[in-house]
Every structure is written in structure tokens, then in C-alpha cells.
Amino acid sequence: MNPNQKLFALSGVAIALSVMNLLIGISNVGLNVSLHLKEKGTKQEENLTCTTITQNNTTVVENTYVNNTTIITKEPDLKAPSYLLLNKSLCSVEGWVVIAKDNAIRFGESEQIIVTREPYVSCDPSGCKMYALHQGTTIRNKHSNGTIHDRTAFRGLISTPLGTPPTVSNSDFICVGWSSTSCHDGVGRMTICIQGNNDNATATVYYNRRLTTTIKPWARNILRTQESECVCHNGTCAVVMTDGSASSQAYTKVMYFHKGLVIKEEPLKGSAKHIEECSCYGHNQKITCVCRDNWQGANRPIIEIDMNTLEHTSRYVCTGILTDTSRPGDKPSGDCSNPITGSPSAPGVKGFGFLNGDNTWLGRTISPRSRSGFEMLKIPNAGTDPNSRIAERQEIVDNNNWSGYSGSFIDYWDDDNECYNPCFYVELIRGRPEEAKYVWWTSNSLIALCGSPFPVGSGSFPDGAQIQYFS
């Protein structure tokens, strides 16, 4: 066979193989299409587990690639969402451990970190996030000048992964406003933001990110809400809102919502004289809120809400161990019904406590005059016994470092616990007014802690940024 004949013979064989592979490819495509149509036409059974079948056929024909892929995916078995029921009591706590620290100001020296204040933590069935009111700027941006002001048109609520400093890329915008609260009922999240003028603000209410209603002011003097998470039971969420003077008589309401709509509202009942910035937690089909009396009391007022009757009452934490800032010295005996006066300077700061009988813990700044340091005090029966005293103390932030607002939160969807493990956060404020020598801005980082059923060691967890680096 001469060379030309050999060439023709080899070419013929190659063409035959190519045609054969092409026919195989076409048959594979036809088979895959028929299987896919059969799959779509077959009624899916319930409670299917996630199954993925991947078939790859690759044929090489003289550097030509033909790929056939079949992917059959079945939906996972997802548990239907249900309303949260507050059927558990609080867990017993022997000490507190840090679960998150975002170091936002330290990162902000070189990264584009958003200026925030009034942060808090709130959880849902998928986990916990940090929420905070941003100032419409980053720390290194010139617009950060003047962010000491609480109420501007540039503020809004954002959420970020817990323990991660807020940046433009990782922050999820939620609503416009300068006061907020947010909570999940097990099915959806309700959020309230307050915006507008001091004398005519508007509360906007969202459920699953859709605007559901608005609320007008009733005293036309800085309508405001909790600055930490609200709490829900069986589809009803309770929120404490105040309108009126910060230094004299104000007008507080306990409002009840279902899917973002008001179903009931009550004017404040009980003996509390002034209510602001409540930190609330749920237990035993009830909600307990530990609040701020910005008018008279260095002892904290509390609101107790029965979520079965949607009724509430108010009074004061009974112990003489005072937990607002500023405050006079601790008293040998407290008062369950009346404010304890005598604060030496600024009238108050947002705070919290867990009133759990013998396992009651209260948080406060270490300094009685300024927002510096932070400590947790175990005071058995502080909520009911005027003569209760400190049994244990745990330092969270040493008194050489700034603190700020603090509040409670609970992961109600932690199914590994037969009780609700109490948690709290501390805002670590930096910048103005305390550090006006170095910077023009005011912002914060955050630490979050949860209870441990076992004894813990010691440690201080300050913000840690060297403020002079920002000069």
C-alpha cells in the first residue's frame, strides 16, 4: 500500500471513529433529556433528603472535546418555621465568657470601618448578628466630624456578622432612623426604626423587611425605643417606646405587634417614674425589661410583661446596689417602688440585668460617675429583696478603659439547652466627648458575652485602639 493509500485509510478510520463518538454523544444527550423530563413529570414525595447525581462523559476526537453532564438535585427536608414560645426559664450562670469581640476601632485605623453607636445583638433560628445605628460615614472619612450627635438624617440601622467590624461591604442595610429595636418571632423578623424631627418623629415598622405600619409621636418630644432587641412569644412581639422629656415626666407605652402590626398598646402602669432604653429578655411565657430612669433613679426600673394576657406592670430593682451611671454610693437597703436619687452628674446610661432569684446578675460601669469600666455582679434576689448584697463580682472591662451602653440578648433557638442561656453585650465608645483632644468622631466597638454553668477565670476586654494613631 503506497503512502497516499495509507493516508486515505487512516483518514477513513478517523472519520468513522468521529461519527461513532458523535452518535454516542447524541444518544447521551437524548437519554439525559428524557431522564430530566421524566424527573420533572414525576410527583415529588415529601421529606426527601438532599441527593445529587452527577454524570460526566468526555470524548476526545482529535483535540475536540464533547462534555455531557447530568445533574439531578432533590430539595432538602426543611423544618417548617414556627412561632417562638417562651416556655423555658433562665439558665443558672456561674460566670461569663466572651463569645465575640469585633475590634472595630482598631481595624478602623487603616480599614474603611463604618461609624456606629447604639449597637446590640439579636438572634434568629439561623444564628446571631450585631445590629447598630450607622452615621452615614466611615471613621477615616471627613464626614465623621460631628458624629457625636445622636439624631441626624444620615443614620440608619445595619446588621453585620457577630464579631466582624462593620464595613460597607459586609453590612446589611435595614431601615433609616436614629433609634431602633428588632426581634424575630420564629417565622419572621420585626424591626422598628424612628426617623425625622425631634418634635414630630415617625416610627416605621417592618416585618420581613416590608413596611407594615407607621406610628406617630404622642408627646412630640423625641419618640424613642429600646436600642436593643425586643422579644416575641407565640407570634406577638412586645416593644417599649417612650415620648417626652428626658429629664422630667415622659410618656411610655408597651406596644404589642403581630407581623409588624399593632394589636394592642398600654400606657405605662406601676410605680416606675421614668422609662427609657429597656433591655428585655423572655422566660416562662413572660418578658422582663430592665430599663433606664433618666429623670430621678440611680436604681433601674423594670417592666414585667405577661405574654398570655398582654398585661404589664412596673417597679424598680429592689437592691440597694445601684447600677445606673452616674450614681451615688451603694445603699444598705434599696427600694422596690421608688427611685433612689442623688446621682452626682450625668443622669443615666442604658443597662441590663437578669433577675433570676438566687442567680440574679446585674451589670454596671465600674466608675460611678463616667462610662468607664464594666463589671457583672451576682446579687441573689436583687429583684425582690431590698437588703440583697453582692455575692460575686466579675470584671469585664477594667476601669482604665471606656465602656458605654449595654444590653441583654438570648439565643432562644439553642435547642441543646433546656433553659435560656443569658447573654449580654457592652458598647465600647471611643472618640468624643472623652477623647476630643485626638479626634472629631464618636464611634464604638462591641464585645458580647454569654453565661457559663461552670466557674470561669478573669480578664479585661477593652476596645484596645490607640486613639493617638488617628490624630
Swiss-Prot record:
Glycosylated residue positions: 32, 47, 56-57, 67-68, 87, 145, 200, 234, 401
Ranges annotated as spanning the membrane: 7-27
Keyword Isomerase: no
Reaction catalysed by this enzyme: Hydrolysis of alpha-(2->3)-, alpha-(2->6)-, alpha-(2->8)- glycosidic linkages of terminal sialic acid residues in oligosaccharides, glycoproteins, glycolipids, colominic acid and synthetic substrates
Cofactor section: Ca(2+)
Residue sites binding Ca(2+) per the record: 293, 297, 324
Region (Head of neuraminidase), start-end ranges: 90-471
Superkingdom, natural source: Viruses
Entry annotation: catalytic residues: 150 (proton donor/acceptor), 405 (nucleophile)
Location(s), subcellular: Virion membrane; Host apical cell membrane
InterPro entries: Glyco_hydro_34, Sialidase_sf
GO molecular function: exo-alpha-sialidase activity; metal ion binding
Enzyme Commission number, as recorded: 3.2.1.18
Topology of this chain in the membrane: Single-pass type II membrane protein
Disulfide bonds: 91-419, 123-128, 183-230, 232-237, 278-291, 280-289, 318-336, 423-450
Activity control, per UniProt: Inhibited by the neuraminidase inhibitors zanamivir (Relenza) and oseltamivir (Tamiflu). These drugs interfere with the release of progeny virus from infected cells and are effective against all influenza strains. Resistance to neuraminidase inhibitors is quite rare.
Binding of substrate, residues: 117, 151, 276-277, 292, 371
Region entry Involved in apical transport and lipid raft association, spans: 11-33
Virion surface-facing ranges: 28-471
GO biological process: carbohydrate metabolic process; viral budding from plasma membrane
Intravirion domain ranges by topology: 1-6
Hypervariable stalk region, as annotated region: 36-87
Protein's job: Catalyzes the removal of terminal sialic acid residues from viral and cellular glycoconjugates. Cleaves off the terminal sialic acids on the glycosylated HA during virus budding to facilitate virus release. Additionally helps virus spread through the circulation by further removing sialic acids from the cell surface. These cleavages prevent self-aggregation and ensure the efficient spread of the progeny virus from cell to cell. Otherwise, infection would be limited to one round of replication.
Sequence similarity: Belongs to the glycosyl hydrolase 34 family.
Additional record remark: The influenza A genome consist of 8 RNA segments. Genetic variation of hemagglutinin and/or neuraminidase genes results in the emergence of new influenza strains. The mechanism of variation can be the result of point mutations or the result of genetic reassortment between segments of two different strains.
The name this protein goes by in its record: Neuraminidase
Classification lineage: Viruses, Riboviria, Orthornavirae, Negarnaviricota, Polyploviricotina
